[in-house]
Amino acid sequence: MTLRLLSLEDVKQSITMSQAIDAMEQAFIQLAQQQVKLPLRTAISIDEEKALTLTMPAYLAQDKTLGLKVVSVFPNNLTQSKPSITGVIMLLDASTGEPKILMDAAYLTALRTGAVSGLATKYFARDNANHVAIIGSGAQSSTQLEAMTAVRTIKHVSIWSRTMKNAEEFAKKLESQYDVTIHEQVSLAIRDADIICTATSSSEPLVHLSEIQSHAHINAIGSHSRTMQEIGQDVLGHSTVVVDQLEAVLSESGEIIRAVEQNTLKKENILEIGQWLLSKELDYKNHSTVFKSVGLAIQDLSVAQVVYRNALKNNLGIDFPIN
């Protein structure tokens, strides 16, 4: 038995953003068709390090994608000049259970998070949308913008970040391609935007109804716990709300949990993107829409499967004998 090992560069060469968006669409359709097995993620806390390790398995029956992602969050690593978040994705042979490929998870996590926003933007943002606001300038900001440019012709980029230095560095990378503006207030960054991408760890709402366009589409991917929220209750109550998975969002998304508890948003009115993709009956492109994603293992494995196929096709990686 051999296990193929991919370097970060191998992974980057083996998938494009457009391929990742297509993989997201197929994964969520399979979820809606109940063709996936998606157990709850398992967390192990390492108290003495104030750290956490998460294990996220999944199986997509249609294309026989079986595997898991393991991610560790060790904040103290920063004192050793090591990344605080590390992880791997392993795919298994769905016929034999044998492990077949191992790859770094950090890049693919950012890519698939961008890709799911790209998928939502493809179907819910105006066709002529050309102005995007990126709220937050961390690891997700680049792939969020990359995904927007994969599905819309973006001309203007507005940036807001709590850390001005990060915003300036991000903007510098974009100046040759877009009309870029850095704003000191979120309200100024979002007021003219057709598309808003929030990728922050905020515990207080950043986006409010009076500050956005009536047709704005919002991708909210930063908050992933009950104590975090990026989108105001007034926005959620006024908009069509679409989520990756209702069960996951009602467990992990602070703003959605609050909106449902306060009856600002009715649970039965929340759309799951996979269910909508099955019919595509209603067009929301001229309305205010919010897409909320907390991340699912099927997203990781679906992009990893694309990487696996392309790596084999292009003979990338090395085979390591393990027995």
Q: For the regions a protein language model found, what residue spans apply to each?
A:
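Short helix-loop-beta connector
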Residues: 124-131, 213-214
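Glycine-rich Rossmann-fold phosphate-binding loop(s) that bind the pyrophosphate
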Residues: 137-138
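NAD(P)-binding Rossmann-fold cofactor-contacting core
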Residues: 150-174
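Rossmann-like adenosine-cofactor binding region
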Residues: 177-261
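Adenosine-phosphate binding glycine-rich loop
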Residues: 229-323
